[in-house]
């Protein structure tokens, strides 16, 4: 819709209709001290040519992955996107489709989402998967709310301090105006969640553990599940790197009741951090409390296989006060992209890619340790890891930017007690020669300090 400002004649005509002589007369009920005085500092209009030049100048300030080597993950990972994905997803049948309310004219969209659910359920080892949330953070927050619906009178959720800080912030935002309570569980010397205090928490509805966690450490999900169930709480397993489960035992196999996390690694670009795709699944017995939509398989009147929305507990389907979620249609395109990615690689491809990521991170870690870096934690890691250096790495990090290398995320901003610690990540997009060159540059800049 275009915005065309009113002409003076139109303004006068409207004032006459409402019986006012001027705009000041129209807004006389607003005290003079509350009105903005002076001109609004809006620049003059630009021609089309000038506008294109203006945006070109703004775009030139951007820094993109293709021009840099980025050794940072922390919830947003640089993975190769097969060319078949943008080709398929650009088809108007998928790209412009809205909520498939009429299954008779939306079988393609519904089947695409159904296949996403099936592949995600296999990856995560769970019974049922919904048609996606906004991102990993909202999926975790919705999982916490889901656990409260199931546990009824219990009002507390325990979150591991090793869960992505942004995820924990979103959960806190969801719960801040409620009577629900969040308790943070500490991290032990190995970088894993310390569950020793669970028995002393009253009204515990659920416990959320991320694996691999924010530090890249692989949690003992099997052991966590047993301890959580021992205190009669629901086990929420979350993740920020879905690819890890191409190599690791799935959360469902480890006893997780609710599984949630970020699927950005599966065919979605980083794009300033979004859009993501919130993966979410649960056990069959909990499915009626799961938010969002589920696409189900059925038979039509002629006995042919078809797909329909089922258990659609969104506020636009049922009464708002009974709804479990208000996640909207735009996530369907992201879910379908993730489904196409999994179908393109297949189980073997995802497993091989996960192994490649593990090996790249292990090689980078070993090379940095040779420079004197000390691992923050000794537990097994996937894709990323935390280190401390015997020299001023912040200065080295700034110098590397001049070489188009973005290396290491300072953990101090998220964990003040981890001053001088940095989080690194390596994926399949980082070649061995890239790693060797970057390590040599770090060594060169570190020696300049001595």
Swiss-Prot record:
The protein's Enzyme Commission number: 1.4.4.2
Quaternary structure and partners: The glycine cleavage system is composed of four proteins: P, T, L and H. In this organism, the P 'protein' is a heterodimer of two subunits.
Keywords: Oxidoreductase
Protein name: Probable glycine dehydrogenase (decarboxylating) subunit 1
Role summary: The glycine cleavage system catalyzes the degradation of glycine. The P protein binds the alpha-amino group of glycine through its pyridoxal phosphate cofactor; CO(2) is released and the remaining methylamine moiety is then transferred to the lipoamide cofactor of the H protein.
Family annotation (Pfam families): GDC-P (PF02347)
Record HAMAP family: GcvPA (MF_00712)
Gene: gcvPA
Keyword Thylakoid: no
SUPFAM superfamilies: PLP-dependent transferases
GO biological process: glycine decarboxylation via glycine cleavage system; nucleoside metabolic process
Transmembrane feature ranges: none
Family the UniProt entry places it in: Belongs to the GcvP family. N-terminal subunit subfamily.
Signal peptide start-end: none
Recorded GO MF terms: glycine dehydrogenase (decarboxylating) activity
Catalytic activity: N(6)-[(R)-lipoyl]-L-lysyl-[glycine-cleavage complex H protein] + glycine + H(+) = N(6)-[(R)-S(8)-aminomethyldihydrolipoyl]-L-lysyl-[glycine-cleavage complex H protein] + CO2
Family annotation (InterPro entries): GcvPA, GDC-P_N, GDC_P, PyrdxlP-dep_Trfase, PyrdxlP-dep_Trfase_major, PyrdxlP-dep_Trfase_small
